[in-house]
Amino acid sequence: MNTNVLPPPDQKAEYVERMFSRIASGYDTMNGIMTLGLDRGWRTATVALAAPPSCGRALDIGTGTGDFLVELAQWMPDGLAVGVDFTLPMMRAGLPKIAGQRAVFVAGDALALPFDDESFDAITTGFTLRNVTDIAAAFREMWRVARVGGTVACLEVARPRQPLLRFGHWVYFQRIVPLMARALGADPEAYTYLPQSARVFPPPDELAQIMREAGWSDVTYRLVGLGAAAIHTGIKRG
């Protein structure tokens, strides 16, 4: 049985920063393996739902090594894609990806974004919110820096609703993924934390309500990956 590695709330931010610093160099490889390569299509769908204008400004929160940043830059050939993260080694690992792109990394915290009000036309975030200490505060910050009419698209973990799929999902992420991490020389604690954090993350309906209470309008979501993930969207109304 896996040992619980989830940190107490007052230690979570420091724990997460240290963990992602440790796994930065192999994160992309392990992430692709862990999601069976489906994460690429999910990111593309998320950016399409955010649909930033071609000459606009888009922000990716918890950008990590910049996979979303690349998608956003390609969507906006005359715009600017900004990725913010508080784990510097992750962004350093992603620098080769954004070479030649209209994209930049910025150090910052999702709960205190280093940007002025109404700075961005679209905001994306992927597999980030389960790592923050206050999901509602993160959505309020997104709302603050979004322009009126701006969009948010959030890709996050979910759990399949069909019982057999849910059981298979549990076995894969709670048992198989940590073993794969060990076999591939990845950090076993990190790849125990990731599925455990997903297990306690709010379900899609609850996350949608958190978004509404943070100020977002027209909130909806779609399930992807047989219900293993969800893409939530919203609009900032005047």
From Swiss-Prot:
Residues holding S-adenosyl-L-methionine: 65, 85, 109-110
| Pfam families in UniProt | Ubie_methyltran
Listed under catalytic activity are: a 2-demethylmenaquinol + S-adenosyl-L-methionine = a menaquinol + S-adenosyl-L-homocysteine + H(+)
Read off the CDD domains from this record. Answer: AdoMet_MTases
Pathways involved: Quinol/quinone metabolism; menaquinone biosynthesis; menaquinol from 1,4-dihydroxy-2-naphthoate: step 2/2
Kindly list the GO molecular function terms attached to this UniProt entry. demethylmenaquinone methyltransferase activity
EC number(s) reported in the record? 2.1.1.163
Q: Which UniProt keywords apply?
A: Menaquinone biosynthesis, Methyltransferase, S-adenosyl-L-methionine, Transferase
Domain of life per record? Bacteria
- Tell me which family the UniProt entry assigns to this protein: Belongs to the class I-like SAM-binding methyltransferase superfamily. MenG/UbiE family.
Q: What does this protein do?
A: Methyltransferase required for the conversion of demethylmenaquinol (DMKH2) to menaquinol (MKH2).
Please state what the protein is called.
Demethylmenaquinone methyltransferase
Q: Which organism's genome codes for this protein?
A: Roseiflexus castenholzii (strain DSM 13941 / HLO8)
